[in-house]
């Protein structure tokens, strides 16, 4: 496997450096015909394949229509927009109905998606718009991972910026199972690529600080498949739960707060309430400490239709919930509730309570319990998470919890203690005790609570909440000058 990935990455770089087309092993994508070009006839499926070409065409049409639904509602008509043109050309023609050659039939240029909504309040502006030209001299191609449909690679652009490339995985489950069933490589390629196209549309329509930024896309011919699609996105780090459990509570809370804000946005998105049918940690990435959803090809906007509450059972491995059926014939809040319970079982229950400040634990426990019982919706959940942030950032959580110390500490400005470290948990540094504090009184309180602490060094570095980072030490036998730090040592003991 390691050898295969190395070979894939090597070929990927070589294809770009030579200025040739993207290699299908690394940047596969959709197989829409070029504008004005009729779809090529596919070979008839082999014997025993159920449904045949008609069934495959039905599935392609269903996915195409789904992408069309999500792409509607932009700021203007699709005419003149390159991605909209490409999408229109993807429409499979009906039996015996030839598709007319459009007047703008010519090779399309690459660029940004053609239907970006105006950014709403708090939404990030559009990122740099990249296309095929940006990918011709990339370096450092590295395989990051793959799922059922897509493979992800990390590359460095000529300007030095690192981005992620997503493309249909030729070795993936979706493409392989389709080819085994229908025996039609290009048709199956198109079917799989519509999931990537759907994700591209949703990344643009759902723009938010906790949705991965779409930077652009590229269509290029690749081997025997014309117009393969590669999307170019913001680069994030995979979510590794075991590693997160070893980080500070402040960083873990930031992830949960990010998730709460994301779920609130999905519940009130321009498309309606969006649910993530595949809600595992691997569907998310971390970008500068913020959690962002990256995999949207299994997202769904439509609520579940119902005739009664028996049709509105939300099933999970550990338990089920029955939701009401509205008078309009839809399960009330099923999309929102599914997201919320998944946030509880994959994130909140592990990351929120452990090693939190004692005065915040009752509120954190109530958040975990309420989401685990689906007693709250996303609005109330986010309001409570924002309350925790306010209490923590303002220092109000310290009221009645920081005892006045009888021990005096001597201040030594512009100095530090280079050694005499000890380990504590959780710490921002694995080899020492590096914690964040709201003020000097909290630093003294922490030192007093550690039996081995005899001194601490206040740095000029702060966390995302504005709290200062402090090293706690076992002694002060060697104090050296440092203009960016201040040392405090116990006056006795």
Curated annotation (Swiss-Prot):
Residues 1-32 form the signal peptide. The modification Phosphoserine is found at residue 177. One of its GO terms (biological process) is bone mineralization. Its main location: secreted. Gene3D superfamilies: Transferase(Phosphotransferase) domain 1. Glycans are attached at residues 137, 320, 369, 400, 460, 484. Residues 28-128 are annotated as: Disordered. The active site is at residue 278. It is found in: Secreted; Golgi apparatus. Pfam families: PIP49_C. Residues 138-493 form the Protein kinase domain. N-glycosylated. Phosphorylated on tyrosines; probably via autophosphorylation. The modification Phosphotyrosine is found at residue 148. GO terms for cellular component: extracellular region; Golgi apparatus. It is linked to Rhizomelic limb shortening with dysmorphic features: An autosomal recessive skeletal dysplasia characterized by rhizomelic shortening of limbs as well as variable dysmorphic features, including macrocephaly, short neck, micrognathia, mild proptosis, downslanting palpebral fissures, depressed or broad nasal bridge and long philtrum. This is Extracellular tyrosine-protein kinase PKDCC. It comes from Homo sapiens (Human).
């Amino acid at each position: 496997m390691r050898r295969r990935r190395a070979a894939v990455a090597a070929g990927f770089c070589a294809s770009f450096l030579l200025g040739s087309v993207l290699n299908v092993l690394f940047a596969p994508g959709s197989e829409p015909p070029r504008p004005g070009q009729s779809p090529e006839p596919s070979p008839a499926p082999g014997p025993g394949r159920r449904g045949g070409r008609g069934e495959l065409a039905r599935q392609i049409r269903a996915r195409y229509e789904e992408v069309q639904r999500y792409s509607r509602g932009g700021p203007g008509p699709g005419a003149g927009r390159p991605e909209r043109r490409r999408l229109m050309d993807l429409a499979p023609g009906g039996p015996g109905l030839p598709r007319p050659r459009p007047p703008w039939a010519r090779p399309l240029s690459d660029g940004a998606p053609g239907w970006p909504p105006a950014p709403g309040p708090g939404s990030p502006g559009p990122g740099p718009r990249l296309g095929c030209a940006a990918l011709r001299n990339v370096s450092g191609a590295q395989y990051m991972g793959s799922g059922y449909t897509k493979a992800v690679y990390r590359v460095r652009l000529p300007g030095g910026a690192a981005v992620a490339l997503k493309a249909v995985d030729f070795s993936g489950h979706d493409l392989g199972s389709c080819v085994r069933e229908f025996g039609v490589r290009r048709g199956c390629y198109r079917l799989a690529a519509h999931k990537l196209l759907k994700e591209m549309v949703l990344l643009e329509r759902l723009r938010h600080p906790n949705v991965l930024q779409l930077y652009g896309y590229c269509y290029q011919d690749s081997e025997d498949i014309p117009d393969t699609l590669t999307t170019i996105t913001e680069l994030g780090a995979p979510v590794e739960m075991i590693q997160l459990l070893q980080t500070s509570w402040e960083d873990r809370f930031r992830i949960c707060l990010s998730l709460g804000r994301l779920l609130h946005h999905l519940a009130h998105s321009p498309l309606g309430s969006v649910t993530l049918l595949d809600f595992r940690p691997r569907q998310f990435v971390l970008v500068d400490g913020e959690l962002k959803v990256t995999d949207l090809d299994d997202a769904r906007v439509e609520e579940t239709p119902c005739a009664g509450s028996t049709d509105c059972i939300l099933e999970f491995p550990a338990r089920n919930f029955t939701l009401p059926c509205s008078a309009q014939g839809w399960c009330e809040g099923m999309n929102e509730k599914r997201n919320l319970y998944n946030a509880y079982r994959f994130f909140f229950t592990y990351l929120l309570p452990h090693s939190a400040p004692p005065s915040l634990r009752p509120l954190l426990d109530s958040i975990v319990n309420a989401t685990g019982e689906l007693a709250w919706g996303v609005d109330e959940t986010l309001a409570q998470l924002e309350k925790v942030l306010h209490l923590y950032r303002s220092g109000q959580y310290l009221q009645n919890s920081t005892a006045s110390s009888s021990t005096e500490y001597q201040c030594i400005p512009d100095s530090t203690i280079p050694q005499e470290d000890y380990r504590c948990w959780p710490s921002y540094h694995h080899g020492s005790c590096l914690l964040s504090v709201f003020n000097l009184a909290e630093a003294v309180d922490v030192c007093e609570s550690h039996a081995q602490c005899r001194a601490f060094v206040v740095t000029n570095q702060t966390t995302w909440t504005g709290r200062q980072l402090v090293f706690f030490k076992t002694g002060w036998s060697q104090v050296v000058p440092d203009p960016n730090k201040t040392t405090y040592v116990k006056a006795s003991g």
